[in-house]
Amino acid sequence: MEHVNEILATVGRILHETTTANTNVANKSTERLGAYIGAGITMVGGATVGLGQGYIFGKAVEAVARNPEVEKQVFKLIFIGSAISESSSIYSLLIAFILIFVSGA
């Protein structure tokens, strides 16, 4: 009878470890999926910055075409504004990298 109890206890431990391991794998997969989805959503910020900068540079070229004397002033302001707006794209990329590689998923 003692052997039966030992066998049942061993089988119970094995089943418990197996179900716990499968649950941990499922939880890690879900966390990883969430990190990837979050990184993708974060990079929408990078895409919108690119669209905005394209629009701004297009309008700057139109302004210079209408009034060539203001070329230096317009492009000085455009490059400063571009550098400032590019920082939000870089922050989006940084957050995406943190979500994927550092979040522990």
Curated annotation (Swiss-Prot):
CDD domains linked: ATP-synt_Fo_c_NaATPase
Major subcellular location class: membrane
Pfam families: ATP-synt_C
Site (Reversibly protonated during proton transport): 86
Domain of life: Bacteria
Protein's membrane topology: Multi-pass membrane protein
GO MF: lipid binding; proton-transporting ATP synthase activity, rotational mechanism
Bilayer-crossing regions: 37-57, 82-102
Swiss-Prot/TrEMBL keywords: ATP synthesis, Cell membrane, CF(0), Hydrogen ion transport, Ion transport, Lipid-binding, Membrane, Transmembrane, Transmembrane helix, Transport
PANTHER family: ATP SYNTHASE LIPID-BINDING PROTEIN, MITOCHONDRIAL, ATPASE PROTEIN 9
Miscellaneous field: Dicyclohexylcarbodiimide (DCDD) binding to the active glutamate residue inhibits ATPase in vitro.
Family listed: Belongs to the ATPase C chain family.
Biological role stated in the UniProt entry: F(1)F(0) ATP synthase produces ATP from ADP in the presence of a proton or sodium gradient. F-type ATPases consist of two structural domains, F(1) containing the extramembraneous catalytic core and F(0) containing the membrane proton channel, linked together by a central stalk and a peripheral stalk. During catalysis, ATP synthesis in the catalytic domain of F(1) is coupled via a rotary mechanism of the central stalk subunits to proton translocation. Key component of the F(0) channel; it plays a direct role in translocation across the membrane. A homomeric c-ring of between 10-14 subunits forms the central stalk rotor element with the F(1) delta and epsilon subunits.
Assembly information from the UniProt record: F-type ATPases have 2 components, F(1) - the catalytic core - and F(0) - the membrane proton channel. F(1) has five subunits: alpha(3), beta(3), gamma(1), delta(1), epsilon(1). F(0) has three main subunits: a(1), b(2) and c(10-14). The alpha and beta chains form an alternating ring which encloses part of the gamma chain. F(1) is attached to F(0) by a central stalk formed by the gamma and epsilon chains, while a peripheral stalk is formed by the delta and b chains.
Protein name as annotated: ATP synthase subunit c
Species of provenance: Mycoplasma pneumoniae (strain ATCC 29342 / M129 / Subtype 1)
